[in-house]
Amino acid sequence: MKVRFLQISDLHFQFQNYDTIVMRDKLLDFIEVLRRESDFDFLLLTGDIAHKGDVYNEDVKEYLNGIIKSMGLSKNNVHLVPGNHDISRDMTRTLLIDSIMKSPNPSEMLDKLDQKATNILVEGQRKFFDFYEDFMGVKYPEEDLHFLYQSEKYNVLSINTCLLSDKKGEEGTLLTAQMKLYKAIRKMNKEKNKGKVLNIAIGHHTLGCIESSERESIKAHFDDYFIDLYLAGHVHDSSFNITANTNENPFLELVSGAIIKDEYATPEFISVDVNLDNGETEVTYYIWNTEYKYWSKNNQGGRRLQEGKLNYKINRLESLIEKEIEDNDDKIDEDEFKSFIIDFHEYRESYKTFTSNFDNQIGLDKKFYDMKSGETFKRKFDSYSEYFGVINHIMDSTSYVSADKKELIAETIVDKYLEFHNQYNNGDEIFVKIVNEIYLECHSVLPYSKALTKKYIKILTCWCIYECEIFNDNKRSVKND
């Protein structure tokens, strides 16, 4: 299962010159081209829709609707946070922010503000809140400030980084109202977040713009709640940062460029593809060619982007495959395993004739190498192989299973292999898919626990890999587009 989305930031819509207008028009056409490659699941808009606090007129909404239409989405799949240019500034708000920042503990003072003072800060975003309700069709949760969206394939934590945004040079000092932020993030289901779902946080400002101690708290929360990606804008120049060796669960910070062309901004946006089955993530940066007026991949962002793409692995998702393969190493009851095989044959009432070709087996080491199988799978295969004799004993005798049903197990597993092997990039994923599919079909009619049923199916699948003509494809020769 895959997830695909775009991040567009710093539209600054009221800023318009010739290059910017042409670039924005071409962007809509280019997004349609990208969509023809593969469908999008959602859109992230990470702030600065307006320019210098200007009004959100019908032209703004029309352009955003054009992006959404080009992506083939509805507004239910759009996630939008404010930027510092979406703020209206006034003297009262500025004086309040100054008093907070000059206090001995600004973060604590912000958390303890009374409602009247909080309202002064929040009112700076009133135009944005009104636009959000008008455009999105739902109210912005201004009292919560930060909020959570959850779905089957992905979760989005929207962080409002602009509560104290007020002046130039504030990067590295911004506060988020951490009590409110923690209240939002703790709504995430930790157990669900550990599963096959992409966990994203978005904000306008990069983490480097947040005050240092609060930034470390945010990173700790990301660690605790399995956040995989943080996406931001603000700096008008794309970048990426991996928090490797910092957290138990590293996350990738992606920063998009802007959708304006001036002497300061890099016109750029980001496309992200994530394979939820193995954590393989592909980030593509698209940049505007001002001279020849077209969008293309940007391969100038460092050595890892030489091909115009950043390849990254979400280890949390990758490890789920290993967990699916793993089970306890307890010895199984061979008599019960025999009963399972017999029961399985009885369950498979209809079947086609299948003949395995034992003369054309290729070496296991070559199978595992060509199929890009991991060490965990190879180790479990070795442990399961001690039960192959039990299976062969049943298959060699008509005392357990009638001769006309001898090939049912092999046929079932081979059919599943043929159905799924082209959908996955390595043997581990194919193995897990085969086991899960057979389990879903038969577990309700077999009198064994879930754990035992899955373990027995794993053993039978490994036996079939050894005895039958499956796992002979070469995944190393397949190039991923």
From Swiss-Prot:
Listed Pfam families: Metallophos
GO molecular function term, any single one: DNA binding
Top-level taxon in the UniProt lineage: Bacteria
Residues in the signal sequence: none
Gene Ontology process terms (BP): DNA repair
Family assignment from sequence similarity: Belongs to the metallophosphoesterase superfamily.
Protein name: Uncharacterized metallophosphoesterase-like protein YydB
Provenance organism: Bacillus subtilis (strain 168)
Species classification: Bacteria, Bacillati, Bacillota, Bacilli, Bacillales
Gene transcribed to yield this protein: yydB
